[in-house]
Design a protein with these regions (language model features):
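Residue patterns forming the tRNA-binding/recognition surfaces of aminoacyl-tRNA synthetases
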Residues: 1-2, 14-20, 56-61, 68-72, ...
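Phosphate-backbone binding and catalysis cores of DNA-processing enzymes
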Residues: 6-9
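Carboxylate/His-rich catalytic cores and anion/metal-binding grooves
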Residues: 11-64, 257, 266
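Short beta-strand segments
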Residues: 24-26, 71-74
């Protein structure tokens, strides 16, 4: 449901595979194709057309396998794509994966793509209406079966099997973690990065290895996420409209919140 793109490695070689029995064509990495086709029990095939690098497929357009979505899916370059297994064409959903999101943001920052990030899962781990009526309300785990059935119904399912792989779990409760792209508040250090690095150089560290550790951390630091989904901590004095979601944060609102908290404590915010 969240698929928006297909990632390919720009340096790998890709070919069209012609399934002679079904008269269908599939785009795959040349090295991975034999194993992938064997997994799908496809034996009667041939390579068609010329070989192309992943870079040559950049921004090529495909359609989402579920026709009801009527969604154009673009091909993006991604160095995270490997030859370990699969087809060399990786499902990419910026709303539900760090690599996926960073690959898309690179294209957005370069002005090559500008699309809304789709995230059809709510904060309780259930599919939203954006996923379609046949999935709405189901947990992400409950949605697996209907999703596979929908692919089969569309004639887009070549094969299926279970895989054992590592998966992120919460370090506290040990439950599996669902990745979601959500709006957060970030602090940028770009305006004072050089000053901070200069201060590190002017500081004597004991032990001396502390210099390189702190210097490298500041040098490579990206925007810092300062917001948390917690009921405790220091609140961010931003006010949101329940209707449109727009926010208001000005020197005046910050000063007003400050005065109230000074008088009543942080519980006043709650």
């Amino acid at each position: 449901p969240a698929n928006q793109y297909i990632s390919v490695n720009p340096k790998f070689t890709y070919v069209w595979v012609h399934n002679l029995d079904a008269d269908e064509y599939y785009l795959m990495n040349k090295e991975l194709a034999p194993a992938a086709l064997a997994d799908c029990k496809i034996e009667n095939y041939e390579f068609a057309g010329r070989e192309m690098t992943g870079a040559e497929w950049e921004l090529a357009e495909f359609m989402h396998p579920w026709a009801s979505y009527n969604r154009t899916v673009y091909v993006l370059e991604g160095n995270h794509v490997t030859l370990d297994a699969g087809t060399g064409c990786v499902h990419t959903a910026p709303g539900h994966g760090v690599d996926d999101f960073e690959v898309y943001k690179k294209y957005e920052n370069e002005g090559k793509l500008k699309q809304e990030v789709i995230c059809p899962v709510d904060n309780k781990g259930r599919m939203t209406a954006e996923a379609g009526s046949f999935l709405e309300g189901k947990t992400v785990w409950e949605a697996e079966g209907p999703s596979i059935s929908a692919l089969a119904h569309e004639g887009m399912l070549l094969g299926k099997k279970s895989l054992h792989h590592q998966y992120a779990h919460c370090w506290r409760c040990k439950n599996p973690v669902i990745y979601r792209a959500t709006e957060q508040w970030f602090a940028s250090i770009n305006d004072f990065r050089e000053d901070a690095l200069k201060a590190v150089d002017e500081t004597r560290f004991i032990p001396s290895w502390g210099h390189d550790r702190l210097y490298n951390m500041i040098r490579d630091r990206q925007d810092w996420c300062i917001s948390r989904q917690r009921s405790w901590g220091v609140p961010i004095p931003a006010f949101y409209c329940d209707g449109c979601g727009n926010y208001v944060i000005t020197p005046e609102t910050i000063e007003s919140v400050k005065e109230i908290v000074e008088k009543e404590g942080t519980d006043a915010w709650l």
